[in-house]
Curated annotation (Swiss-Prot):
It comes from the Bacteria. SUPFAM superfamilies: Ribbon-helix-helix. This is Putative antitoxin VapB1. The keyword Protein biosynthesis does not apply. Antitoxin component of a possible type II toxin-antitoxin (TA) system. The cognate toxin is VapC1.
Length: 79
């Protein structure tokens, strides 16, 4: 496993992470590890939009209506 060290983190940010870790009943290391993994493995907005656009472009039915996909895409784009 890799080790990551973050330097020059503002104290208020570090304190917020410490509080959140405590509230979650986790060590700071465990909490930060979980958040980093979730951040990478979760889909971001651009990835979600790309998936929707691929579904719209495909000839096979994605199982939902084109209107639903387009509405979801508009919502993800903030408009």
């Amino acid at each position: 496993m890799a080790t990551i060290q973050v330097r020059d983190l503002p104290e208020d940010v570090a304190e917020t992470y410490r509080r959140r870790a405590t509230a979650a009943g986790q060590s700071l290391q465990t909490y930060m590890r979980t958040k980093l993994i979730e951040g990478v493995r979760g889909r971001d907005k651009a990835e979600a939009i790309e998936i929707l656009e691929q579904a719209l472009a495909s000839t096979a039915s994605p199982g939902i209506s084109r209107e639903t996909i387009e509405a979801s895409r508009r919502e993800l784009r903030g408009g």
